[in-house]
């Protein structure tokens, strides 16, 4: 049985409507929007919800496939659009692993060798569910987004796949923050190394401008800027 057949009918209807239509963006007056952000793995909207609340000219699209978390973000601000789905390198459906630590939930499975570096944290998988996935280039095309000024990614092991899913539209993204695992053994199967991420980003015209240590030095947030993309950068 494939992932699509496991998804509830309402989820399939939502997916079909989104992929055939123009998403939720047409409900906004584009003439009043001066900045567009995309938050992938929004969790509780750290850093992006407050920005939307304080700037009516900012439009944020927040992707959060965990419905419990997504429901806490919905209807918080008219310019903060919550999309209860995941961003990946394919359009369709995928298995999503819900972790005891909700910000560790992921489309990727955990590597038991990598988990040994996280003995101080409960990282047991509570359940799994089927979620809708969409590529960034599909999303940007359907919503007719000319650019994304800021792309914030916290997708637990699949951050680089999110970037790669932008395809040719990557050149229309001005600033990207993503997370990398810098432990000797990475936590998620298939997660790229710090060097692989930097090589890919620099090869696509991005410059590393900031590094922030996370989780007792086991992860880092890397921020990249693409000067030729133009737009407004936070």
Segments from the language model and where they lie:
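Phosphate/nucleotide-binding beta-alpha loop and adjacent structural elements of enzyme active sites
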Residues: 1-234
């Amino acid at each position: 049985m494939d992932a699509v057949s496991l998804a509830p009918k309402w989820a399939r209807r939502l997916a079909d409507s989104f992929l055939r239509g123009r998403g939720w963006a047409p409900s906004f007056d584009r003439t009043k929007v001066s900045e567009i952000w995309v938050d992938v793995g929004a969790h509780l909207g750290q850093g992006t919800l407050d920005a939307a609340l304080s700037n009516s000219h900012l439009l944020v699209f927040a992707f959060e496939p965990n419905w419990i978390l997504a429901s806490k973000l919905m209807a918080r601000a008219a310019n903060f659009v919550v999309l209860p789905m995941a961003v990946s390198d394919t359009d369709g459906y995928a298995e999503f692993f819900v972790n005891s630590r909700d910000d560790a939930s992921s489309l990727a499975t955990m590597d038991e060798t990598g988990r040994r570096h996280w003995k101080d944290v409960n990282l047991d998988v509570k359940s799994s569910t089927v979620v809708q996935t969409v590529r960034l280039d599909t999303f940007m095309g359907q919503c007719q987004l000319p650019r994304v000024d800021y792309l914030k990614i916290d997708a637990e092991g699949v951050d680089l796949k999110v970037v790669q899913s932008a395809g040719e539209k990557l050149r229309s993204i001005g600033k990207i923050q993503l997370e990398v695992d810098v432990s000797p053994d990475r936590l998620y199967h298939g997660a790229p190394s710090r060097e692989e991420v930097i090589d890919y980003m620099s090869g696509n015209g991005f410059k590393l401008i900031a590094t922030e240590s996370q989780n007792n030095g086991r992860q880092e947030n890397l921020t990249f800027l693409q000067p030729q993309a133009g737009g407004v950068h936070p």
